A protein has these predicted regions:
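Long, contiguous binding/interaction regions
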Residues: 1-55, 59-178
Length: 178
């Protein structure tokens, strides 16, 4: 697989899982997916606006197994507070990519034009390479990497997808704080 091929399986679903911010919770959640034979295509975890609650955003390959089965099992875990299946059209989804690209005196201007076109930014520069930071949808980042590939991609690191529902409603409300 080259750098521009999509790594997300075609049949995926995004779950937003609110959990108690305690040691071992992520391990139990990930172990549940593994035991049930689900492939996690993307995983991002971080604190919410409430320090005692963390949000796990997980993109799951559902080609082989129905999503309903895993949500029922997740709900049985003690530290899981809430699970929401995020619908793509009602959700803002983003990933972060850092990519180190070869860029010497002869190619640097072309690389920087691509950076500008994608509203990305250069976060480090050396005589023979630049490191670029970009955020966006998976499709946008795949397109960026495709345009940078001819220059020579030296290294890529991507975050997991993070997602939030559109509109004014919040996933974590005060009722979850018990």
């Amino acid at each position: 697989m080259n750098a521009t091929e999509s790594v997300m399986p075609a049949d995926t679903q995004t779950l937003s899982v609110l959990v108690e911010n305690k040691p071992g919770v992520l391990t139990r959640v990930a172990a549940l997916f593994a035991r049930r034979g689900y492939n996690i295509a993307s995983l991002a975890v971080g604190p919410t606006e409430h320090p005692e609650i963390s949000r796990i955003t997980v993109v799951v390959d559902v080609a082989q197994h129905p999503l309903e089965q895993i949500t029922k099992q997740l709900n049985k875990l003690v530290n899981v507070l809430k699970i929401v299946q995020l619908e793509p059209r009602q959700t803002v989804q983003r990933e972060l990519v850092l990519v180190k690209v070869s860029a010497d005196n002869t190619t640097r201007t072309s690389v920087l034009e691509i950076v500008q076109m994608f509203r990305a930014k250069v976060v480090d520069a050396a005589a023979d390479a630049v490191t670029i930071e970009a955020t966006g949808t998976q499709d946008k980042l795949t397109a960026l990497l495709s345009m940078l590939e001819p220059f020579g991609i030296r290294e890529i690191v991507k975050s997991g997808e993070v997602a939030i529902s559109r509109g004014g409603r919040a996933l974590a409300d005060k009722s979850l704080l018990g």
